[in-house]
A protein has these predicted regions:
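Luminal/periplasmic active-site loops of membrane-embedded glycosylation enzymes
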Residues: 49-51, 226-255, 259-266
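Multi-pass membrane glycosyltransferase architecture that uses lipid-linked
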Residues: 1-226, 258-392
């Protein structure tokens, strides 16, 4: 498949997203359940505060970098759907990046394009972005870091990585894997080489720059709402997390050390272990994929947009996964069914008033088990030394 044919696919996928953006406006006016993500309304309100000369953090529950609100100022002065269009456009850029990363790994154009289509035509990606969720921005910059590392541009990779951490905290978890991927096979872990110094220095400077700018304009409230809050948050609302019911039952109590350790240590141990297990440049994308699955699966809060974190990395690793089609179908079906069971239990609670908290928790346990099974099978099917196809 040539670049022109691929461009046609990108235009078609963007057009499909724009149709959904147009539909979202109709849906919100005619149905009780809103299509538009509640966070999108928060973004728009925060942008309106900026246009009025105030702080975006004057809007309750705005807990993001101020730059998202700045980007969405046209929501207020031009078109309310502007942000959804921007997020949809970044969806297309993500697909292009996936293709370029695979082409850079010497996979042929057919394989690279097919894998990128798994994101380009992914209905979940389409819906989440057109609902107005901003995670497509974070995902794009995470993949851009992987692209620059593959191109041996360590300074630029660090600069982008610093911004991606400022934009969303979760890319921070990939830092150790990136650092280890740049070490020499015969070098000591504790002695950094020039590549590692370039990556770390540029990342720290970039992160400090963006954070300092935000602090200069919005002070401590920026630090608390966009950074500190995410470290201490305790969300007792029902969500996919396996920890939901525990947090719900202890909502009125201050979290103890045991509770924090129970929810944080398993994730930390696995993230560090995966960083060392796949500590080579060749395996970096797969290390990031497995870490993203762990972060989402073990997170005290899990919502649908978090699936972006690993679904965007899966196509990059797909050519090195030796798994039968039947196994792929079984795992995908199990993942969707487990998620659907949880959604049904949540529906009974939200719209029928049925006390289904225990069923939501049990469904969350099932979803957790399915996610772990998917992770294990993906790891077992990965072949880092699998010969890539010759470029056509």
């Amino acid at each position: 498949m040539g670049d022109k044919r691929y461009a046609i696919h990108c235009c078609a996928a963007l057009a499909a997203r724009l149709v959904l953006v147009a539909y979202s406006n109709f849906h919100d006016k005619n149905f009780n359940v809103s299509y538009t993500d509640v966070d999108y309304k928060v973004f728009t309100d925060a942008a309106r505060h900026i246009t009025e000369g105030n702080s975006p953090y004057d809007r309750d529950t705005y807990r993001y970098t101020p730059f998202i609100a700045m980007i969405l100022i046209p929501n207020v002065i031009i078109c309310q759907e502007f942000g959804k269009i921007v997020f949809s456009f970044f969806d297309i850029l993500i697909s292009i990046l996936i293709r370029q990363i695979l082409l850079g790994q010497k996979f042929n154009d057919k394989t690279s394009s097919f894998c990128s289509f798994l994101w380009l035509y992914n209905p979940l990606a389409m819906v989440i972005s057109t609902r107005g969720n901003a995670d497509s921005l974070a995902v794009f910059f995470v993949l851009l870091v992987a692209y620059y590392l593959q191109k041996d541009n360590y300074w630029l990779a660090g600069i982008v990585h610093g911004f991606s951490i400022h934009l969303r905290l979760y890319p921070l978890a990939f830092s150790l894997a990136m650092y280890l991927a740049l070490r020499k096979s015969s070098g000591l872990i504790i002695v950094p080489n020039k590549k590692q110094v370039a990556l770390v220095l540029s990342c720290v400077l970039s992160l400090l720059t963006w954070t300092s700018l935000s602090y200069y304009f919005y002070g401590y409230k920026f630090l608390y709402e966009s950074l500190l809050y995410h470290l201490i948050r305790k969300d007792a609302r029902h969500n996919f997390s396996v920890y939901f019911y525990m947090l719900y039952l202890s909502a009125n109590n201050a979290p103890g050390i045991w509770q924090r350790a129970f929810t944080f240590l398993p994730q930390l141990i696995l993230l560090i272990g995966l960083s060392f297990s796949y500590s080579s440049k060749r395996n970096l994308s797969f290390s990031m994929l497995t870490q993203a699955i762990v972060m989402v699966t073990y997170n005290p809060v899990m919502t649908s947009q978090y699936f972006f974190w690993f679904l965007s990395l899966l196509p990059v690793c797909l050519p090195r996964l030796k798994m039968s089609i039947s196994r792929c179908v079984v795992l995908t079906s199990a993942w969707i069914i487990a998620q659907s069971i949880w959604l049904f239990a949540a529906y009974l609670l939200e719209f029928k008033g049925f006390n289904s908290f225990i069923y939501i928790w049990l469904a969350g346990l099932l979803f957790f088990i399915v996610n772990i099974k998917v992770l294990i099978d993906v790891m077992n099917s990965y072949h880092s030394t699998m010969d890539v196809e010759k470029s056509q």
